[in-house]
Swiss-Prot record:
Family statement drawn from the similarity comment of this UniProt entry: Belongs to the TRAFAC class TrmE-Era-EngA-EngB-Septin-like GTPase superfamily. AIG1/Toc34/Toc159-like paraseptin GTPase family. TOC159 subfamily.
Gene (name only): TOC108
Positions contributing to GTP binding: 372-377, 489, 537-538
Name of the protein: Translocase of chloroplast 108, chloroplastic
E.C. designation(s): 3.6.5.-
Region feature G3, mapped onto this chain: 416-419
GO molecular function annotation: GTP binding; GTPase activity; metal ion binding
Organism, as annotated: Physcomitrium patens
Top EC group: hydrolase
Biased composition annotated in UniProt, kind: Polar residues: 37-53, 84-98, 249-268
Length: 994
């Protein structure tokens, strides 16, 4: 072996002196395989810079034969002969030209058992090496594979040592591998899209490094194993000498440039992600914080004596991982696969180093329950000392108090409350106590709520439902979303079952738990709730284990289990706040109450409705909502009625003497004169109204007061209460008609109170389920205002509607309408403040702008609207409006278009046609609807037709006819009756029943 070393050294010196291109070949002890015959890969590089690398390695000791095992010495000659033959072939090759120098290639040579040489395929080599690591049945999968998502070779990463303490190869092997890594980096820059090939290369390099580490525990490319589990192989380091910045900037990616000395320059790519965005950095920070939460929870479980395989621990860890993936979409190959192992290892390491250290964790617990169930005794059992006074004969806790202590180095803060009474007559007492609790917890919201009850209570009904509903009404339904049911006296003997045999303990606990959980669901109004149940036994005679911990009949140690449930809830709340999966709890709102998004489409529809402006009492006579428009369209034609010739009405006897044609002509003439007379009266009313406005504008306040006094002195007749007509009640099975009970009078009082009739009510019911109150008044003789309210209550629900409005005129053609509304939406009251201003742009154009704000369930929804009304001629009116409403980060957009075509003699003829189109966009869901309505006279019959259709394909068509002469129209009602009889006889569709 010494002679072989001398020959190899002499040949290398000769090649260096001749300055020729020779392959650099260094063989380590791992290049020689054992008798198992496994394939070994030897990489040989051809480079013009070989002289420099050789000159640096002349002083290094030879590796061949230095640590060769005895059983391999016989095969060394064969291996050395093959290497020498290959070197001679390479040295005999002519010197490459400049063109060939610009595109050098690395030749990989495989030495097989027989000593022959063959060219190796890089993809096959990488595949075999990766399979050798991952598929070996004796090797436990190592976390090293997780590094493939990152850059495999990084100069900033520390070299991980193998189990025997070796740093990897010698400096010669490290330099050789650095050249190979540089060439690999150039290839990666040339083809960045081939991510799979890069990952395979990184894995192969890690495997080759592990094989060259000299670890006797594995042959070739297997990572080291030890008592602590698999360890990562040593990562190859980057070369110490880097390419100058100027040279790096001048070289284009994927193209080789020639240095002045003729050596080939290699493009070196940075392995650190310098162009990482702020989102990625924030995601890494979030994952790190979440990992700290995992470590904290595992430390909590370890201190409570619970293993990671505990059901509660495993479920919490699973939820943390699921929440992380949903929030950030983190790749499982980066943190998901081994985050638990790392967290568990860190938790065990920190606990081993600091067992007595107090954790940076505190939990606040609120206890609620009936008196005498054992709340204070449980608090004493948790802290293993007397923190609260207890008594077996009377309530011992008289006020809300706070108990603070440490359990296994964990700070626990318990809010002890007085006991509640289950009787319905004691609800006032319970409300007073819970009012104190609600005031106390405003300072610091509790993390978990423990509701106490006894396991040995033999009640299978909902006797505690009034008490639980009182808790729900005061704290909200969200108090049960983060509550744990605690059943005390858990060592009680199970009662006898229906067959006289005692129930099993599991069945006893399940039945009692089901009753309490079902009662909570009824009180919260959510049948999906599933509160966890924990059993507690505080009696001194309770069975204990060797460590003195109290054990239940089912073998469970109740104290760690109860604390683990409390801590798990706090941990999940911290993770939820970190990942922002749900909206955070607002200050002063305990138990994580979440405000609901208001019904924006409903509120937007109410905002877009056109509202009539209020007017003074002397302006309201004979006016309608469209009176302002009618005032501006006074007909300029002469009054045709005064120019008509005299007309004498005929008596009944004279009509009978006329023929049919004469009678028809007479009726037409009479109808025309009646129509023209009504038109004359309508014009006179408009003219009188305009004159009154002008006169009122010219008169001063004193003159108005004198005019009112003169009217009072004129001796107007006093208003006499007049009974209002009875309302038409629906048919009833009752013998007597109860209308006499609800008669009311129309008095001179400004307050108008009327009953509200529900025509579609219950049988054997009067039909009156509410009342309505209205009042119109004037503020400071200029501002008309109105107040109206309605309250309805039936057997299921109650509704309240209140509206207050006032109009303020501030200039010619400018009116502002303000209002305050209260209405019932679901089970909540919505308070709305609105204001809109209408002004005249032109003679036939009016524009309205309005704002609104609605307060509903601790949420404010605000919106704006814009409306424009245009008159085209005397018959066509266009109304266009649009608005937007926002609340709780949500928005709804809407608008409508309405075109109205009036008859020639409207409003006398009552001929009117309306075409409407509405659009609303909410959450990207576009709703489009159209409706058409037309009413006209056919002789003396009023015909009304309606049709509507939306973009979802649903619509409705209705036709209504009303006449006082065509009584035969009543026969149409026979059609549905006949259809029902036919269906009952022959079945639906006319088919006979089988």
């Amino acid at each position: 072996m010494a002679e072989l070393e001398k020959l190899a050294a002499a040949r290398l010196e000769k090649e260096a002196s001749n300055n020729t291109v020779n392959p650099v070949r260094e063989v380590s002890e791992d290049d020689v395989k054992d008798v198992s015959g496994e394939t070994t890969v030897v990489t040989t590089s051809i480079s013009e810079g070989a002289n420099e690398s050789l000159s640096k390695k002349e002083d290094e000791p030879a590796l061949i034969g230095s640590n060769v095992p005895e059983e391999l010495e016989g095969n060394s000659l064969e291996v050395q002969s093959a290497i020498t033959t290959d070197l001679e072939k390479v040295s005999s090759t002519p010197t490459p030209s400049n063109a060939e120098k610009e595109s050098p290639e690395a030749t990989e040579v495989r030495i097989v058992e027989e000593g022959k040489l063959e060219k190796a395929d890089p993809s096959v080599v990488n595949e075999e090496l990766s399979k050798e690591i991952l598929e070996d049945p004796e090797v436990v999968p190592s976390p090293a594979k997780m590094y493939t998502a990152l850059k495999a070779v990084d100069g900033d990463m520390p070299v991980l040592k193998s189990e025997n303490g070796n740093d990897g190869d010698t400096d010669a092997n490290t330099a050789d591998e650095d050249n190979e890594n540089d060439e690999d980096d150039v290839d990666e820059d040339e083809d960045e899209d081939d991510a799979d090939m890069d990952t395979a290369k990184a894995l192969a390099e890690l495997a080759m490094t592990a094989g060259k580490s000299g670890n006797p525990a594995f042959s070739g490319t297997k990572p080291s194993m030890g008592a602590a589990g698999p360890s990562l192989p040593s990562l190859p380091q980057r070369p110490a000498v880097r390419k100058p910045i100027a040279a790096t900037a001048s070289d284009s990616p994927g193209r080789n440039t020639q240095r002045p000395n003729g050596a080939l320059s290699t493009q070196i790519t940075s392995t650190t992600d310098e162009s990482a965005s702020s989102d990625a950095a924030e995601g890494d920070e979030t994952r790190e914080k979440l990992q700290n939460i995992r470590v904290k929870f595992l430390r909590l479980a370890h201190r409570l004596g619970q293993s990671p395989q505990n059901v509660v621990v495993a479920q919490v860890l699973y939820r943390l991982g699921l929440a992380e993936s949903l929030r950030g979409g983190s790749a499982p190959n980066r943190s998901g696969a081994f985050s638990f192992d790392r967290a568990n290892a860190l938790a065990e390491e920190q606990e081993a180093a600091n067992q007595e250290e107090e954790l940076d964790f505190a939990c606040t617990i609120l206890v609620l329950g009936k008196t005498g169930v054992g709340k204070s005794s449980t608090i004493n059992s948790i802290f293993d000392e007397r923190k609260s006074v207890t008594s077996a004969f009377k309530p011992s806790t008289n006020k809300v108090q706070e108990v603070i202590g440490t359990v296994h180095g964990i700070k626990v803060r318990v809010i002890d409350t007085p006991g509640l009474l289950p009787s319905v007559a004691d609800q006032q007492h319970n409300e007073r106590i819970m009012g104190q609790v609600k005031k106390y917890i405003k300072k610091a919201s509790p993390d978990i709520v423990l509701y106490f009850d006894r396991l040995d209570m033999q009640s299978r009904d909902f006797g505690d439902l009034p008490l639980l509903r009182t808790i729900t009404d005061l704290f909200g339904a969200a108090v049960w979303f983060n509550a744990i049911v605690v059943l005390t006296h858990a060592s009680s003997a199970p009662p006898d079952g229906p067959n006289g045999v005692p129930l099993s303990y599991e069945m006893f606990v399940a039945q009692r738990s089901h009753v309490v959980q079902q009662t909570i669901r009824q009180a919260a109004g959510d049948m999906r709730l599933m509160n966890p149940v924990s059993l507690v036994e505080n009696h001194p005679a309770c069975r204990t284990n060797r460590t003195g911990q109290r054990v239940l009949p089912n073998g469970q140690i109740w104290k760690p289990q109860l604390l683990l449930l409390c801590f798990a809830s706090k941990i999940l709340a911290e993770a939820n706040s970190l990942l922002k999966l749900q909206e955070t709890t607002a200050p002063g709102r305990p138990f994580g109450q979440r405000s609901r998004v208001p019904p924006l489409p409903f509120l937007l529809s109410s905002l877009l409705q056109s509202r009539a402006q209020l007017k003074l009492p002397d302006e309201q006579a004979g006016e309608s909502d469209e009176s302002d428009d009618d005032e501006e369209e006074e007909d300029s034609d002469a009054d045709d009625y005064d120019e008509l010739p005299p007309f004498r009405p005929l008596s009944k006897e004279e009509l009978e003497d006329l023929t049919k044609e004469q009678r028809e002509d007479y009726m037409e003439e009479l109808a025309d004169r009646e129509r023209m007379f009504q038109k004359k009266q309508y014009r006179e009313e408009i003219r009188r109204r305009k004159e009154a406005k002008k006169r009122q504008a010219q008169m001063s306040k004193e003159e108005l007061a004198e005019a009112e006094e003169a009217e009072d002195e004129a001796g107007n007749a006093a208003a006499v209460p007049v009974p209002m007509p009875d309302m038409a009640l629906p048919p009833s099975f009752d013998s007597d008609n109860p209308t006499h009970r609800y008669r009311y009078l129309e008095t001179a009082n400004q307050w108008l109170v009327r009953p509200v009739l529900e025509t579609h009510g219950w049988d054997h019911d009067a039909g009156y389920d509410g009342f309505n109150v209205e009042k119109m008044f004037v503020v400071k003789e200029k501002i008309p205002a109105s107040v109206s309210g309605q309250v309805t209550k039936d057997k299921k629900e109650a509704q309240v509607n209140f509206e207050a409005a006032a109009s303020l005129r501030h200039g010619e053609g400018k009116v502002t309408l303000t209002g305050f509304d209260v209405q019932t939406i679901g089970k909540d009251l919505a308070y709305t403040v609105r204001a809109e201003t209408r002004f005249n742009n032109f003679k036939r154009n009016k524009t309205t702008a309005g704002v609104t704000a609605t307060y509903l369930n601790d949420t404010i929804a605000a919106g704006v609207k814009l409306e424009d009304r245009v008159l085209i001629g005397k018959r066509v009116k266009l109304v266009v409006n649009g608005g937007v409403l926002t609340g709780k980060g949500d928005k709804a957009y809407g608008g409508s278009l309405e075109a109205t075509l009036r008859g020639k003699e409207y409003p006398l003829s009552r001929t009117l046609s309306t075409l409407g189109l509405s659009v609303m966009d909410w959450h990207g869901d576009l709703a489009i609807g159209g409706n058409l309505q037309s009413q006209f006279m056919v002789g003396k019959t009023m015909m009304v037709g309606r049709a509507n259709l939306n973009n979802r394909g649903s619509g409705q068509v209705s036709i209504r006819a009303s006449s006082s002469e065509q009584l035969q129209m009543v026969l149409i009602g026979i059609v549905p009756i006949l259809r029902s009889l036919i269906n009952c006889r022959f079945g639906f569709g006319g088919q006979s029943q089988q």
